[in-house]
Amino acid sequence: MSDEDHDFSHQGGGDNASKTYPLPAGALKKGGYVCINGRPCKVIDLSVSKTGKHGHAKVSIVATDIFTGNRLEDQAPSTHNVEVPFVKTFTYSVLDIQPNEDPSLPSHLSLMDDEGESREDLDMPPDVALATQIKEQFDSGKEVLVVVVSAMGTEQVLQTKNAAEK
């Protein structure tokens, strides 16, 4: 399920808002999202076994954690509900990169959205190659756009974008 397949308007707000919603396992689609072991994951493969003597077809799910990239697998009867995370993506311009006082910790990012709202609560991504790419683009004076993904109470920079792709 792509983001276009979901209506996120019923999510609600605040800390008490649900971070997931139920969906029958048989309705999952490749490219959609699912929670496995309490982690938000993107489905990379699905297979459905035939109905057995106990009456339920089983859905085998192979997915990757959207924040760590770890591969996870799960199975569920096709008629049973699985938890699907609300996943939102945002694009921000990088205004500044501030080194952390502790060099063993990631630098902080100053970001601005399309409406001019700024935020300074995100760190550089843990992916060293991505963090290096952001820093090099920023240091060269180019406009750096980052894509932030939010799911299940976690937000993280997952990629960069060219300003022309905005």
Curated annotation (Swiss-Prot):
Pfam families: eIF-5a, IF5A-like_N
Compartments it resides in: Cytoplasm
Gene3D superfamilies, per database record: 2.30.30.30, Nucleic acid-binding proteins
InterPro entries hit by this protein: IF5A-like, IF5A-like_N, NA-bd_OB-fold, Rib_uL2_dom2, Trans_elong_IF5A_hypusine_site, Transl_elong_IF5A_C, Translation_prot_SH3-like_sf
Biased composition range(s): Acidic residues: 112-121
A GO BP annotation: positive regulation of translational elongation
Molecular function as annotated in GO: ribosome binding; RNA binding; translation elongation factor activity; translation initiation factor activity
UniProt KW keywords: Cytoplasm, Elongation factor, Hypusine, Initiation factor, Protein biosynthesis, RNA-binding
Post-translational modification comment from the UniProt entry: Lys-53 undergoes hypusination, a unique post-translational modification that consists in the addition of a butylamino group from spermidine to lysine side chain, leading to the formation of the unusual amino acid hypusine. eIF-5As are the only known proteins to undergo this modification, which is essential for their function.
Region ranges (Disordered): 1-21, 101-121
Entry superkingdom: Eukaryota
The protein's role, per its UniProt record: Translation factor that promotes translation elongation and termination, particularly upon ribosome stalling at specific amino acid sequence contexts. Binds between the exit (E) and peptidyl (P) site of the ribosome and promotes rescue of stalled ribosome: specifically required for efficient translation of polyproline-containing peptides as well as other motifs that stall the ribosome. Acts as a ribosome quality control (RQC) cofactor by joining the RQC complex to facilitate peptidyl transfer during CAT tailing step.
Similarity section: Belongs to the eIF-5A family.
NCBIfam families per UniProt: eIF_5A
Name of the protein: Eukaryotic translation initiation factor 5A
Organism the protein comes from: Leishmania donovani
Lineage start: Eukaryota, Discoba, Euglenozoa, Kinetoplastea, Metakinetoplastina
